[in-house]
């Protein structure tokens, strides 16, 4: 059975005490709910190794929120793919709107990161999505095409095999206002159809997560959509209880 992919993006949050209590709770209550899900946790870089130790005997994978395009050298403050792989990272988030806007990351930079992650046999979680203004001007599909095209051009039709795409409409991130699940379903179908125009990979092998103001009260309607294959969760992943509630709902749907 195909698994549901749930990624926790902690962003710039967490501390040693929080991490300890978070995993203490998960270890007590989560064991029977992880089988039907692939759960990934992406903490701040400084806590990657601590989280790695906590998940060593759990069915949870380690993710990174970012990676540099350089492997080594005089690049103060950066983290290379070799370092991430060395400590056990399996998934790397790239293209998040906060990186695009706050750190001025272009489609070209994101495509380079994508290539580096694939070359290192890790799995990229590629974020795409439109702003509220772009949505109002009916530019959602055009924006997503642009965000995918450079990767497709540089890496060819095999680029989208064994990856995760995360559709995160920027107007829904951290606002408390989630997108309509049926609208998200249509966008996911569009993304899959667009990829399949250029690639012969199996449709069922295209994994697309949704991200944007997800919580345990609204998640069921998203999980029920056939082309929503996972979730990229921000604020709701900081509470072990809330995060586990979401995992439980996904587990029950896929049981």
Curated annotation (Swiss-Prot):
Where is substrate bound in this sequence?
Answer: 9-11, 174, 213
Keywords from the UniProt entry:
Cytoplasm, Gluconeogenesis, Glycolysis, Isomerase
Methyltransferase as a keyword of this entry, yes or no, is no
Keyword Acyltransferase set for record:
no
Name the residues annotated as catalytic in the UniProt entry.
96 (electrophile), 168 (proton acceptor)
One Pfam family from the record? TIM
Query: What do the Gene Ontology cellular component annotations say?
Result: cytosol
GO MF assignments = triose-phosphate isomerase activity
Question: Which reaction(s) does its UniProt entry say it catalyses?
Answer: D-glyceraldehyde 3-phosphate = dihydroxyacetone phosphate
Q: Give the disulfide map.
A: none
UniProt EC number: 5.3.1.1
Q: What is its main location?
A: cytoplasm
Sorted alphabetically, the Gene Ontology BP terms of this entry are: gluconeogenesis; glyceraldehyde-3-phosphate biosynthetic process; glycerol catabolic process; glycolytic process
Q: Where in the cell is it found?
A: Cytoplasm
Q: In which pathway does it act?
A: Carbohydrate biosynthesis; gluconeogenesis; Carbohydrate degradation; glycolysis; D-glyceraldehyde 3-phosphate from glycerone phosphate: step 1/1
* Classification via PANTHER family: TRIOSEPHOSPHATE ISOMERASE (PTHR21139:SF42)
* Assembly description: Homodimer.
**Family recorded in the similarity comment:** Belongs to the triosephosphate isomerase family.
State the HAMAP family in the record.
Answer: TIM_B
Q: What does this protein do?
A: Involved in the gluconeogenesis. Catalyzes stereospecifically the conversion of dihydroxyacetone phosphate (DHAP) to D-glyceraldehyde-3-phosphate (G3P).
Return the protein name: Triosephosphate isomerase
